[in-house]
């Protein structure tokens, strides 16, 4: 079986393992109103690149979760090396069943992970994000948007990155949200 595309790219040293790269992450950060006082949850943090950047820039406390134990170990080491290990708590958790109390976070950030989920799972994830957000909290996310629904595009993308994907059109994303 072939290795998932994002894991292969990580082995090559690529740090931004999502569509949109640093530019999309920078847009989310600019929209976030991050500060030291805010409690942040990053879902699907992978190797912790965004969490580390947020901790360095804003000094905020971050909980960063992922399902990949190996990626979390890399993330922990990277955060320590960057001098922000005390600000970030890395945990293994499922986005569809987050182990946090209701209204726990000011900001939930999630980058290009929902596309990797089936449609019903996308909705479950978003419902969990909203559950753990405080009233007036902010959900920051970006993902793959199709101009038109074409099964051939989905299949081609899945084959290219060796992961079953489900990108949506604007209408599809609006239904999920």
What are these regions (language model features)?
Residues 5-19:
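Class I SAM-dependent methyltransferase Rossmann-like catalytic core
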Residues 18-36:
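Conserved alpha-helix/loop element of class I SAM-dependent methyltransferases that forms part
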Residues 39-41, 47-97:
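Class I SAM-dependent methyltransferase SAM/SAH-binding core
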Residues 96-108:
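A short acidic, Gly/Pro-enriched loop at the edge of an enzyme's catalytic core
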Residues 107-121:
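A short SAM/SAH-binding and catalytic strip from SAM-dependent methyltransferases
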Residues 123-138:
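A short glycine-rich, Lys/Arg-flanked "PGG" loop and its adjoining helix->strand segment in the class I
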Residues 144-164:
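Short, glycine-/aromatic-enriched active-site segment of Class I SAM-dependent methyltransferases
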Residues 166-177:
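Short alpha-helix
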